[in-house]
């Protein structure tokens, strides 16, 4: 039982006190301001708050909190404070931004301790999100079933606070967090109205959500690590199975040094778990019956241990050879490539049918066209239309915007097995650009192209920086044969790219 506690305690013995006084330090808000200026995190920050940041406002906020004069004012009060001359909601934004930096300090201290060689808890084989790409290339085609899991949100905000108190012992900080959450968010749901959540730092919400996810993932990983020892057995062979596991333990102890690479035969349960944003997948070589058991493990764990309402319909079982998995912006499946081999032996000949499993990643063209249609680049059928809101810009600015979006989409979907759908997206953006320019100059598309030619659209097809690097690495013959373009290329930064993030 002591061994199991290592998995379930989440290293909670390592708690840190006295985080609350940091809310009165000016450098905390300076760090929060630096987070806001980080362009890579632009989708996590409130730009209105960043633009209004100043050291004078920080000093006034600290004085106000130190005097305990109404730490937080209701979000419905949008009037300006006559004494300070600023919107009261601005102070709430700054407090939540500063608190988002403070609660991350215990985790930063753990990283410092690890770099100094101190002992840390087991990582349970947790890996970076970038390990998804080698998993798809090396392991995905060997699996049979996958659980497509839609992670439920906590139905009560107190669950988020309870998850954080295992890491932070400072009661004052937790009281401040609880008060802020209950003051500005809907008490019935984690999904709050935009008016309420806009004055609360999104970075803090993501941190609380990830802390809560880490809580139930630790229990799931414990079950995963023990799954290889929980095989169903009949009572008739139960004693033989005990001796069998005893032999396995003996083999693991004797051959650990000499045959370490072969230990996967005994230890690897062939279960892979990946979480990305609000979704997760559980892939395995098990049968559909065992995957159905894992499905109800998830539902029961969420409902009875974490008090989150979840239905079995939120967890779907897909057979990879028949269905595609919508994950990371791709439709991934396992395709069978049939091959016929003729074998000649003396006077007899044999024909052998082989089916090789191969990973197939396709672009969800329907949903992508829907996104382009919503952004007013085409209609619902995929026919390009002009972008009237951009017609007031200069020609070079219009072309740069379209080229940027086209390259971002090409960069993101470079891991696709088939590039035909990507060429269609490029076609839509190309002619949407032409129609926008023709609209600006009050001319038809045909007359506009006839007058200027298509040379000015060469930027859509010019060699990108990544392709230029590949042309230097790979031989020119291999590069010009276009095999490189047909192959999958995974770029590690696509996990934080919104496909149309730069179209506004």
From Swiss-Prot:
Gene Ontology cellular component list: chloroplast
Keyword Chaperone: no
Spans through the membrane: none
Main location: plastid
Highest taxon in the source lineage: Eukaryota
Compartments (UniProt record): Plastid, Chloroplast
Key words, A-Z: Chloroplast, mRNA processing, Plastid, RNA-binding, tRNA processing
Entry's Gene Ontology molecular function annotations: RNA binding
Pfam families: Intron_maturas2, MatK_N
Record GO biological process: mRNA processing; RNA splicing; tRNA processing
Cited PANTHER family: MATURASE K
Family as reported in the entry's similarity comment: Belongs to the intron maturase 2 family. MatK subfamily.
Known function: Usually encoded in the trnK tRNA gene intron. Probably assists in splicing its own and other chloroplast group II introns.
Name this protein carries in UniProt: Maturase K
Naturally occurring in which organism (per UniProt): Adansonia digitata
Lineage: Eukaryota, Viridiplantae, Streptophyta, Embryophyta, Tracheophyta
């Amino acid at each position: 039982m002591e061994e199991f506690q290592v998995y379930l305690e989440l290293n909670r013995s390592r708690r840190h006190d006295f985080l609350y006084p940091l809310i009165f330090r000016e450098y905390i808000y300076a760090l929060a301001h630096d987070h806001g200026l980080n362009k890579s995190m632009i989708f996590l920050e409130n730009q209105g708050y960043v633009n209004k940041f100043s050291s004078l406002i920080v000093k006034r906020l600290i004085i106000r909190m130190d005097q305990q004069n109404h730490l937080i004012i209701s979000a419905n009060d949008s009037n300006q404070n006559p004494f300070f001359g600023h919107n009261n909601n601005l102070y709430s934004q700054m407090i939540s931004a500063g608190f988002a930096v403070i609660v991350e300090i215990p985790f930063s201290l753990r990283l410092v301790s690890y770099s100094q060689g101190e002992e840390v808890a087991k990582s349970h084989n947790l890996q970076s999100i970038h390990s998804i790409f080698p998993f798809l290339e090396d392991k995905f085609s060997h699996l049979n079933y996958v659980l497509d899991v839609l992670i439920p949100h906590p139905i009560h905000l107190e669950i988020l606070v309870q998850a954080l108190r295992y890491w932070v012992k400072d009661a004052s900080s937790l009281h401040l967090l609880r008060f802020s959450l209950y003051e500005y968010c809907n008490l019935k749901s984690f999904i709050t109205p935009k008016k309420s959540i806009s004055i609360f730092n999104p970075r803090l919400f993501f941190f609380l959500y990830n802390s809560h996810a880490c809580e139930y993932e630790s229990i799931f990983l414990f079950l995963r690590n023990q799954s290889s020892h929980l095989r169903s057995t009949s009572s008739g062979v139960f004693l033989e199975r005990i001796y069998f596991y005893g032999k396995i333990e003996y083999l693991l102890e004797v051959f650990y040094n000499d045959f370490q690479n072969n230990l996967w035969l005994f230890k690897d349960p062939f279960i892979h778990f990946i979480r990305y944003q609000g979704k997760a997948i559980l892939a395995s070589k098990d049968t559909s019956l065992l995957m159905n058991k894992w499905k109800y493990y998830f539902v029961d764990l969420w409902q009875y241990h974490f008090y989150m309402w979840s239905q079995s319909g939120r967890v779907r079982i897909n057979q990879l050879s028949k269905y595609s998995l919508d994950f990371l912006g791709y439709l991934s499946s396992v395709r069978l490539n049939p091959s016929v081999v003729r074998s000649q032996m003396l006077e007899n000949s044999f024909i052998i049918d082989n089916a090789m499993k191969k990973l197939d990643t396709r672009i969800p063209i329907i949903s992508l066209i829907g996104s382009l249609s919503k952004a007013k680049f085409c209609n619902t059928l995929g026919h390009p239309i002009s972008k009237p809101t951009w017609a007031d810009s200069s020609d070079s600015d219009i072309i740069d915007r379209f080229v940027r979006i086209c390259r971002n989409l090409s960069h993101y979907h470079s891991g696709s097995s088939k590039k035909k759908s990507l060429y269609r997206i490029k076609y839509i953006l190309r002619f949407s650009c032409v129609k926008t320019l023709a609209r600006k100059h009050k001319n038809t598309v045909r007359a506009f192209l006839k007058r200027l030619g298509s040379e000015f659209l060469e930027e859509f097809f010019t060699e990108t920086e990544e392709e230029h690097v590949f042309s230097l690495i790979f031989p020119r013959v291999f590069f010009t044969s276009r095999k490189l373009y047909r192959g999958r290329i995974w770029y590690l930064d696509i996990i934080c790219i919104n496909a149309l993030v730069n179209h506004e």
